[in-house]
């Protein structure tokens, strides 16, 4: 379903959460387009948490702790990084209204960022929405090789430790396929989403948020689940 919403100002963070619970999410045509439209893909991208794959070379990078990882320490800067053009991604769909809405979800504790630092500089990261035991990945960026990949590894470790059941990537790219992402039909996705929204909520802060998590620890958590 792609329905144009010409009155984006009527969407609130609360409305956004209800939309995620129904399996839909907003996008904009471009950063300069003030309007939003709702999206409900026929085929949905997910990464099974018990099937998350880390290539050997990336595992060595994660284990080396070449990057320092933090959580929810630079949410706005991560959104800025995701909205900026990158090689292979010259255009962005993150407009001002998207920034406002997800900033509101962050203030409510439903939107989180994972930051990747090198020598005190933010070089990569990602952000997404948590609801129940589901996490909806929104966007990621990198300014140094493997930075966003390392952020994803740490995110998955945090989701596993916190009791999450569903990692929704919305769409599947060749990049995400290397981590085990697959496409599933909307009907199957709806079943998984309903299950993830029933019962106790997961805890995104189950792992410490006040100190960096070692790469070896993140990999051990993932290996235990897999």
UniProtKB/Swiss-Prot annotation:
Transmembrane segments: none annotated. SUPFAM superfamilies: Acyl-CoA N-acyltransferases (Nat). It catalyses: N-terminal L-lysyl-[protein] + L-leucyl-tRNA(Leu) = N-terminal L-leucyl-L-lysyl-[protein] + tRNA(Leu) + H(+); N-terminal L-arginyl-[protein] + L-leucyl-tRNA(Leu) = N-terminal L-leucyl-L-arginyl-[protein] + tRNA(Leu) + H(+); L-phenylalanyl-tRNA(Phe) + an N-terminal L-alpha-aminoacyl-[protein] = an N-terminal L-phenylalanyl-L-alpha-aminoacyl-[protein] + tRNA(Phe). One of its GO terms (molecular function) is leucyl-tRNA--protein transferase activity. The keyword Kinase does not apply. One of its GO terms (cellular component) is cytoplasm. It is an enzyme of class 2 (transferase). It comes from the Bacteria. Its EC number is 2.3.2.6. Pfam families: Leu_Phe_trans (PF03588). Keywords: Acyltransferase, Cytoplasm, Transferase. GO terms for biological process: protein catabolic process. It is found in: Cytoplasm. Belongs to the L/F-transferase family. Functions in the N-end rule pathway of protein degradation where it conjugates Leu, Phe and, less efficiently, Met from aminoacyl-tRNAs to the N-termini of proteins containing an N-terminal arginine or lysine. This is Leucyl/phenylalanyl-tRNA--protein transferase. It comes from Bradyrhizobium sp. (strain ORS 278). The gene is aat.
């Amino acid at each position: 379903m792609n329905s144009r919403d010409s009155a984006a100002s009527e969407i609130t963070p609360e409305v956004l959460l209800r939309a995620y619970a129904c399996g839909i999410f907003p996008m904009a045509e471009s950063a300069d387009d003030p309007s939003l439209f709702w999206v409900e893909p026929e085929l949905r991208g997910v990464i099974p948490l018990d099937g998350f794959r880390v290539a050997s070379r990336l595992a060595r990078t994660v284990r080396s702790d070449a990057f320092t990882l933090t959580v929810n320490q630079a949410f706005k800067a991560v959104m800025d990084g995701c909205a900026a053009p990158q090689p292979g991604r010259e255009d962005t769909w993150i407009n001002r209204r998207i920034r406002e809405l997800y900033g509101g979800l962050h203030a409510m504790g439903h939107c989180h960022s994972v930051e990747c630092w090198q020598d005190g500089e933010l070089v990569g990261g990602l952000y997404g929405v948590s609801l129940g035991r589901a996490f909806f990945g929104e966007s990621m960026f990198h300014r140094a090789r493997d930075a966003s990949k390392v952020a994803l590894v740490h995110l998955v470790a945090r989701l596993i430790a916190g009791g999450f059941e569903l990692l929704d990537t919305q769409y599947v790219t060749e990049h995400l396929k290397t981590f085990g992402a697959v496409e599933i039909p909307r009907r199957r996705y709806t079943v998984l989403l309903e299950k993830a929204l029933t019962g106790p909520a997961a805890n995104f802060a189950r792992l410490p948020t006040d100190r960096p998590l070692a790469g070896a620890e993140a990999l051990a958590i993932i290996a235990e689940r897999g």
